[in-house]
Amino acid sequence: MILRRLLLAGSLLLATAFTSAKKADGPKISVTKFKDEPVNLFYFDDSDTVMFQDGKNGDVYVSRDAGANWDIVDVSGMRGKAWSLLPHPTDRTKAYIMSNGGTHWVTEDQAKSWREFTVDADLSRYEYPLVFHGKDSNRVMLLGHKCNGLDCKEKTYYTTDGFKTAHLLMENGRHCAWAVSTPTFGEGLDLPKEVNDRIFCVVSGLHSSWAEANRLLYSDRFFKDEQGTEVPLDNGRAVSGVIRTASVQKYILAATKSARTNELALFVTDNASTWHRTEFDGHRVEEDAYTILESTSYSLQVDVVSTYSSTIGTLFTSNSNGTYFTRNIEHTNRNMYGFVDFEKISSIQGIILVNTVKNWEDVEKSNGVQKKVISKISFDDGRTFQPLKVGKHDLHLHSVTDATNSGRVFSSPAPGLVMGVGNTGGHLKDYLDGDLFVSDDAGINLEEKLWTMLINMNSVIKASNWHKASLPDGVQIRAKVLTTAPGSTTLKFLLLGSAKADIGMEYYIISIDFAEMEDALVRRKTSKIGCQIERENEPDADGHKHPDAPEGVCKNPDDKFTGSSGFRLIPGNVCIREGGVDLDKQTERVCSETFKNPPAGQIVVEKSFFTADYYKDYFYLERKESSKGEDETVIMITSEQQIFLSRDHGKKWKQILEEEKITRIEPHRFFDDVAYFLTNNGDGWYTLDRGDTFRKFKAPLPPNQDKLPVLSFHPDRRDWLIWTGADECNGNGGNCHSVAYYTTNLGGEWHFLMRYVRRCEFISRDARGSSDKLVFCEQFENENPSNKHLQLLSTEDWFAEKRLHYSNILDFATMQEFIIVAIRGENSQDSLRIGVSIDGKTFADAELPANVQIPIQRAYTVLESRTHAAFLHVTINNIEDHEYGSIIKSNSNGTSYVLSLSAVNRNSRGYADFEKMQGLEGVAMANVVGNVADVENGAAKKFRTMITHNDGAEWTLMRPPDKDSEGRSYACSTKGGKPTDACALHLHSYTERADPRDTYSSPSAVGIMIGTGNVGDYLSLKSKADTFITRDAGITWEEVKKGKYQWEFGDSGSIIVLVPESTPTKTLLYSLDEGRSWKDFEFSEVEMQIQDISTVPSDTSRNFLLWGKEVGQGKKPGIATVNIDFSGLKERSKQCVLDEKKPEADDYYLWEPKHPLQPNGCLFGHRAKYHRKRPDKDCYNGRELQHLDSIGDICECTRSDYECDYNYEPQSDGSCARVAGLEPLDPKLVCTENPKAVEWYEPTGYRRIPLTKCQGGKQLNHIVAHPCPNKEEEFFKKHPRLRGIGLFFVILIPICLAATAGYYVYNHWDGKFGRIRLGETGSGGLFDRDSLLVSIPVSMVAGVVAVITALPLLVSSLWRSVSGYVRVPGGASSRRPYSSRDSFAARRSDYVGVVEDEDELLGTDDFDDDEEGDERNGQV
C-alpha cells in the first residue's frame, strides 16, 4: 500500500461498503501522544503485540492490543538505557533490547518477560549488532568493541543457548556471519553436519589493516584453538580485499575489491564449501553500484548500475546455483541511495513490476536531464517484460524510489491483488498528479478506482463509497507511516504521524480497529477457478552461455568437445521434460569457438610499427584481481601526439581520439581503470573501463600555464576531481593566475574552489578519520603571486570555512600516514623547517636529529613511507654534481627524527638513490657517497650500495657472490664471508634510470631482486656493469650474466626476461626457474635497439612488451613494439595448484624471509611465511597470488627490533649513545599528550621500530618507569613492589639461614677451622669434610661470605629499584650514570659488578673486528 505524501489526517477517509450497521458505524480509533518520535516499531508475527523504541530517552514501549494502549517496558536496570530494539528475524517470540554498554535484555515470550545478559564489550560502531542463525534461534552472534584509551578492538561474541551464556569468538573481526543465515539455506542439499556450526569472518590482512588486504576466514569450532581457515573463493585460492558477506535465500555472497579499482568481484556458494565467481554477461559490478533485490529460492536477482549514471541500472537474474547472470531488462530506474523500482508481487511467484528510464541516452549524456520513467511487468520471472495497461493506454506507477510508507509498495499477501498510484500516458508524472489504480488479477488488467482495500488472508473487500472518520479530540497530524501486522491477517492498523507542539514536535500513534465492523463487511464471492493451460507442461528456456572447453581437451582449433548448448532451464521452472523441447541438452562444439586460443607450445611474437620518431610515454590500465575480463590494456602517446590503445598487451593497436588535439594523458593516480585525455582548450575525454568506452567532458578553464598538475584525484572517490586552470591568460599578460575548481561527478558540474592557487589536493581519510571533503591548497598570500609567499590552507566544506596552517611554505607532500610540509625559516628565506600531521588538522614541528650537520636546511626529498614511519632525505651538499644528504627516519607519529643513513646520493632534480623492496616490508637499498671528504674538495662522487633489513635501523654493505657467472673468482675477497670496504656488491640505482618504473623488485615476485653493477670497493661505470640477482631479499647475490641488461618479471616471478641495454640485438634471455638457468629466444629477424621492456605493473602477466626501433639491415622506419607472449609455452600452459590447507603439497612452498644478523630467523619480531612457486614446477601462477600465507611465531625482542632514539646515534659496536651536549626528548610528554597514560620511562637511547611485532625479550626502551602525575594508584597496581615488612624479611631470612648453618658446622665439624691434617686417608667420621653434612654447610658458609660482601651492592640495587618507581631526593641513581660502553668504563669504580646479561643492553654485539663494525654502523 502506498500512502500519499501529504495525507491530511485531521480526518480519515475510509472506503467501506456497509449494509445496515449491525455493530458499529465506523472503526474504533485510539490515539496515544508521545513527546519523542517512535522508532524501530515492529509487530510480533501473528499477534497484536507491538513494540517501539524511544530513541531519545532510551525507553521501550509495548502494546498488547495492536497499539490501542502502551506501557513502558520496566525491567530492573533497563529504564533509559535502550540503545536499540531488535526483533528476531525468524523466531516470532524473541526480541532484544540492547544498551550501549555490556548489559542487554532478551524476551522469549513476546515481551511478557525479559531476561538480562551481559558481554564484556560495547556494541559495534559499524555493524548491525546481532547476527542470527537461520535455523536455530538460540544461536546468535554479538558484534561489539572494547576500548582502552585510544586503542579500540572489535570483539565478537557468540551464544548457542540464547545468551544464557556468551563466549568470545574473536578479536578484531570486521564482520562475522553464520553459514546458515537463512531458513532456506541448504534446502535440498545433503550438507555436512559441521556446516551448521560454520562461521565466516572478515578479518584484517596479516601485514596490513587496509581494506584491500582483508581476508575471509571460516571455522567449524568457533575459532577455538585456531586462527581459522582462509576461504578458497577463486578456484581453490584465497582472495584478498574481502569487503563483506551477505546471505540471500539459499545463497551466500562474498564481495571483494582490489586496490586501485572500483570494480568488485562477487563470489557465491549454496553449500558454504564450494565457491564460484559470478559472471554478469560482460557487465562491470562496482562498489556501491549494485543492489541485491528480493530473490527466490531458485535464483538471485541483482540490479547493477550502468557505466556512467548512478541512477540507471540493469536487472540480472542468476541460474540455479547463483553463478551465471543473464540480463533481464536494461535502464532500470534507481536512486542515489541504491533503491530500485522493483517489486515481486506477493504470494504469486514469477510476477515482477519494474520501472525503466525511457530517455536513458539523454540522461547519460547530461546530468541535468529529467528522467522519463515508464512501468513494465513480467509474468515469467523477468525473462520478458510488457507495458502495464489500462485499456489501450500505457500505465506508469510510482514505485520504491518514491515510497514513503513501510512494507510492500504494490501488493499484499492477498493473492493477485495489486494497487498503485500513477498515471497513463507517455511517462510517469509527479506523484501529486497521480491516481489510484487497482488490479485483482495480478496486474493483467488495471482499473482506475477511488477505492481502497481492507485485506485479510481470506477476503478482499471493494468499496466504491468513501466514508469519513474523524480523529478524537480534534487531533490533526501529518501522516508518516500506515502499517499493519506482517501477514496482513488482522483488521487492525497503525498510523504514525507528527504535529507541531508549542516547542518542537509531538508524535502520535493511532490505532484503527475494524474488528467491530466485521459483521457489516460485504464478503466477496469466490467463483470456481479452473486451470487453463495453452500447452501442456511445455518447457521454457532462456539464457545463452559462452562455451568453455574442458581443460586439456583442445589442443588444436579443429578439435571438438561436448559443451553447453547456450540455453538453460529457467530457474524455478518445474516443467516436465519428457516429451518437451530439450534445448539445454549438451551439444558437440568446435574448439575454435572458445574464447581462449589453444596452446601453441611455444613463445608467440607480434611486432607493430608506428610512424613516429619516438614514443613520448606509455601507461598500463591494469585489470585488477577483482575486475572482470582478460584484457591487458596499454595506452601510448607518440612524438606526433598520436594516441594508440591496445587491449591485448600490444598485439594489436588502434588509434583513438584521432580528431581531438590531445596534448597529455593523465592516468588516475588511485584507480587503474581510469585515464583522462586533455587538450589545451579545456576539452577532455575520460575512460572508466580501461579504454573500452570514452566520454567527453568540458573543463571550466584551459589548463594552467604554471607547469602545475592540472588534475588532482581523490584517493577514495573515483568521480571527484580538482581542476587547476588558467584564468585571465589571454596573451595580454597582466593578471594571469591559476584557479581551482572541483567536481563530484566526473566533470558533469564544476564548482569554484579557490583562486591564486599553486596546488590543491584531496587528502585520504584512511587512518585519519577525516571528512571525504578534506582538501589542502597552496595559495599565494593576499592573492598576490608576486610576493611568492605561499600559505597552506585546508577545508572540509569546499572553503566555505578554511583553516590556515602555515603562512610561508615551500611545498607539502602527502603519504598514506603523514602530511609533511616544508616551511621557510622565520629568520632566513634560505632555511627550512618541517611540519608534520597525521590527522590533517593538527601539525607539529619535526624534531630533526642534531647529529645531522645541516648548515642551512635547503632541500628535502620525501621518500616512500609505508611502514608507519616517514623517511626524508635532507640535502647536506647542494652543489651541482656533488649533491648528497642524509636519510632521517621518524617515529610512528612522524615528529621525532633520527639519523638512518649518512651521505646518501642525490641528483640535481632532488631524487635520491633510495629504494624499498616491493612485496616485503623493511628491506631497502641506498647508494651512499663513499668519498665525502674528497667530494667536499671538488672530486667526483664514488658510490657504495648499502642494504637494510630492519627498516633503516641498521645498514650494511652487500655481500658479493663467491664466483661470477663464468665460475671465476672476483679480484677482491670478503672477510669471513662478510663484505668489506674493499670488497662488496654495488648496484646502479634510481638516479641513473631512464624510466623510474624499472625497479629492482616486483610486488608479486617476493624476495627476488635484479640489478646491474659490480663487485669491488666502489660502483664502477654503468658501461662496465654486470647483472645480478638475489632470491632471499638481498642476503646473498648471484651474477647471472656478464654485461648490463634490462629486466622484467612476469607471472609473479616464474618468468624473468632480460634484454641487452644500449646494444642492438635480435634475442632476449628468459628464465623459468628464478634465474638459475637461462635460454635464448630470437624475437626479431632484424636487429633492434630496445629502449625499454615492460609488462603490467603487478608483474602477473605472461606477456611482455619491448619498446624500440629496428636498426639492422632491412630495418623499417619509425618506432616499433614487440609483444612476447609466453602463455602458449608448454611449461607455462597449466595453472599451478595451491591448497590453502596444505600449502606445500602441490606446486608451491613456503618461504620465510630472514634477518642476516639474527640466527633465529625472525624479521620484525615474527616469522612470516610466503607462498612461492617451486622453481622446478612447469605451471603458471595466474592472476595475482596472495603471497603472505601466515604470520607464525611472535619472537622475543632483540637489539634488531630497536633503533636509536632522538638525539642518540649508533656506535661502532651497535649500541646507541647520546650525542655529546644534547638532551633526549622530555619523556614526561607522554603524560600530557595522552591523558590516559599511566607511566613514563626514563630515556635509554633506544626506541622500538614501528614495524616490529616482537613481545617480551629485551625491553630496551622500557627499563625505569615512573608514574604520571595523579596516576600513582594505577601505576602501583600495574607495578606492585616489595616494601615494608616483606622487603625486610627477604633480606633477613637468607642471612639468618646461612649464619645458623655456619655456626652449626663450626661447632660440630671435628676438623675445626685452622687445623691442618696431612696424610690421613681414613674414612673419617660423621663430620668428615667429604661428608654431605659437611660439604653442604661449607657451601652455606661461602654463601654467608658472599651475602656479606654483596650486601652494599644489594642495598644500592634495592635503592635504585625503589627510587626508580618513586623519586627519592638525593639518590645517586636519580639519573642513569651511563649511556654507552665508554662512559660506563669511565665510571667503573662506581660499580661492584654487572650481570652478564646487561652487556647486550649496552650494545656489546659481537663483531669480527672494529673496522668492519665501523663500516656497517658508523655510516648510519
UniProtKB/Swiss-Prot annotation:
Keyword Transport in record: yes
Keyword flag Transmembrane: yes
Bridged cysteine pairs (disulfide): none
Membrane topology (Cytoplasmic): 1306-1331
Gene Ontology biological-process annotations: Golgi to endosome transport; Golgi to vacuole transport; protein targeting to vacuole
Lineage, highest ranks first: Eukaryota, Fungi, Dikarya, Ascomycota, Pezizomycotina
Leader sequence segment: 1-21
Sequence ranges on the Lumenal membrane side: 22-1284, 1353-1420
Cellular component GO terms held in the UniProt record: cytosol; Golgi apparatus; membrane
UniProt-annotated location(s): Golgi apparatus, trans-Golgi network membrane; Prevacuolar compartment membrane
Membrane topology value: Multi-pass membrane protein
Keywords: Glycoprotein, Golgi apparatus, Membrane, Protein transport, Receptor, Repeat, Signal, Transmembrane, Transmembrane helix, Transport
Protein name (Swiss-Prot/TrEMBL): Vacuolar protein sorting/targeting protein 10
Family: Belongs to the VPS10-related sortilin family.
